[in-house]
Amino acid sequence: MAVFTFEDQTTSPVAPATLYKALVKDADTIVPKAVDSFKSVEIVEGNGGPGTIKKISFVEDGETKFVLHKIEEIDEANLGYSYSIVGGAALPDTAEKISIDSKLSDGPNGGSVVKLSIKYHSKGDAPPNEDELKAGKAKSDALFKVIEAYLLANP
């Protein structure tokens, strides 16, 4: 298995503590409200802390799909959160898992800076498919913007 690491950063007008609360602490209720295509978030294993696996169900192209999301680490004091995609529609056949480490910090005008480190754990040594990476990033960015808009409209 090879591991390929990608770094990303974005800004948001939403304050770090508010964004963290919505994306980590209250995500199971906020995300289905904010994102029409998301139908449910259910815990399939664990108690909500590290090691917990969540099944996130959503509709894409008229078909119900799911993602298995495993919580790796919660660092509320430093606004950090780590999780892995371990199964379902968002995990390409070429990957064993995709791990995401996120960290929020103060940004311009009371907003946030979001730093991401994405680790693609491939099956074998083959690098990830560039088109799959671009499509995944586009979906992730769009999802983030929808949640951000929801938070701005519902302070």
From Swiss-Prot:
Protein's UniProt name: Pathogenesis-related protein 2
Any one annotated GO CC term: cytoplasm
Gene3D superfamilies, per the entry: 3.30.530.20
Family: Belongs to the BetVI family.
Single GO molecular function: abscisic acid binding
GO biological process, one term: abscisic acid-activated signaling pathway
Domain of life: Eukaryota
Disulfide-bond pairs as recorded: none
Coiled coil: none
Annotated source species: Phaseolus vulgaris
Induction details: By fungal elicitor.
Keyword set, alphabetical order: Pathogenesis-related protein, Plant defense
